[in-house]
């Protein structure tokens, strides 16, 4: 059974939750052993996969979890706005660290390495390739280039203003166009995640609402302050 077939089976049985285990940078939780513990807890709670950033985090998580890992490396580049897995060496390192799926930025922006070359390198390692996209055009272009999975990860993050709500219409449009879609980005409640499935998502990635304690505390603090004013 292929990894996609196994994921199809697990998603049908469990509902399709993917947990992104990416603490706030510099947080007390931003340690490989804690990231790995989050990943294991997510697996034990029914997540069908986890998303992990960074080689050290991935290596430790790989030693603990059996569910597929979506691996990424984030970089801040002077010459490009692309942050997610921008280099071929990043793909190689993620493959060696134990990723099952490697995600790249799939947007049509200036970049050091083409999307086509990155996808080909992922497939060279016999791994699944995921493209984090911001629009229907991005998603369809990446699908034509061979991406196995299209994520809505970048919707709202390539423009000056980021909306509060997730981009459900993008999920539907990509699904209707024949893409295997992972809904990702601002799915901060179970209700929104369920909506994504109804809009055609294959699975839903949730990060901040599960693994970023500072964000969650901030939401509660803001609500309590408003209630008290």
Swiss-Prot record:
EC number, UniProt record: 5.1.3.9
GO biological process assignments: carbohydrate metabolic process; N-acetylmannosamine catabolic process; N-acetylneuraminate catabolic process
GO molecular function: N-acylglucosamine-6-phosphate 2-epimerase activity
Tagged with keyword Nucleotide-binding: no
Catalytic activity entry: an N-acyl-D-glucosamine 6-phosphate = an N-acyl-D-mannosamine 6-phosphate
A Pfam family the protein falls into: NanE
Zinc keyword on record: no
Family named by the database record: Belongs to the NanE family.
InterPro entries in alphabetical order: Aldolase_TIM (IPR013785), NanE (IPR007260), RibuloseP-bd_barrel (IPR011060)
Keyword annotations: Carbohydrate metabolism, Isomerase
Protein name as annotated: Putative N-acetylmannosamine-6-phosphate 2-epimerase
Pathway in which the depicted protein is active: Amino-sugar metabolism; N-acetylneuraminate degradation; D-fructose 6-phosphate from N-acetylneuraminate: step 3/5
Highest taxon in the source lineage: Bacteria
Role played: Converts N-acetylmannosamine-6-phosphate (ManNAc-6-P) to N-acetylglucosamine-6-phosphate (GlcNAc-6-P).
GO cellular component: cytosol
